[in-house]
Amino acid sequence: MTGSMIVNNLAGLMMLTSLFVISVKSYRLSCGFYACQSLVLVSIFATLSCLFAAEQLLIWSASAFITKVLLVPLIMTYAARNIPQNIPEKALFGPAMMALLAALIVLLCAFVVQPVKLPMATGLKPALAVALGHFLLGLLCIVSQRNILRQIFGYCLMENGSHLVLALLAWRAPELVEIGIATDAIFAVIVMVLLARKIWRTHGTLDVNNLTALKG
């Protein structure tokens, strides 16, 4: 198996884990699947670094391991503490429909990325299609889920997808760019988690349908 095939397969595994993040009922399981997905992303960065002798991506992989594999799951686990796991959740789409939509999104993205010239290798276009699809799947999660914590997970999925797109298209970007992206993502998750916890303590619900009357 060539290096490009390994990267493409790992990218496909990222899409699969994202469906588990969205679909499982337990918040802690979602955190676990997100950590696994982020570990796959770190593996992709490390593989690309070895294939193309890109020291920047090795630094990216170390940064992503600290922020995405360790910090974000810990923050999301904190957000879910003391929140019952058996609260009925409403969503526009069930797990089966989300899987079908994910497949359609990746198929559409495969056509979109055809004209794109990758600076690394043309054999990585499937990974680029999955990365773009991963971003859109995170956006779909935000739109379709009615639970605030699920929407935060959707943001995290979007961030992972955009991170992989950046690695494939602009992998020579300075390390400061990667540090800035990771820092922004961490602070965004922290702010959203604090707001979600405040809403839960005040109103006893995380369903956005019940929060339409909130005033600033």
Swiss-Prot record:
InterPro entries: HyfE-like, NUOK/Mnh_C1-like
UniProtKB keywords: Cell inner membrane, Cell membrane, Membrane, Oxidoreductase, Transmembrane, Transmembrane helix
Side Cytoplasmic, residues: 25-38, 81-92, 144-150, 197-216
Signal peptide segment: none
Sequence ranges on the Periplasmic membrane side: 1-3, 114-122, 172-175
Spans through the membrane: 4-24, 39-59, 60-80, 93-113, 123-143, 151-171, 176-196
Gene Ontology biological process: anaerobic electron transport chain; anaerobic respiration; formate oxidation; glucose catabolic process
UniProt EC number: 1.-.-.-
Localisation per UniProt entry: Cell inner membrane
Domain of life: Bacteria
Pfam family, one: Oxidored_q2
Predominant location: membrane
Gene Ontology MF term list: oxidoreductase activity
GO cellular component: formate dehydrogenase complex; membrane; plasma membrane
Membrane topology: Multi-pass membrane protein
Alphabetical list of PANTHER family matching this protein: HYDROGENASE-4 COMPONENT E (PTHR38601:SF1)
Function: Possible component of hydrogenase 4.
NCBIfam families, per the entry: PRK11492.1
Protein name per UniProt: Hydrogenase-4 component E
Organism, as annotated: Escherichia coli (strain K12)
Gene name tied to this protein: hyfE
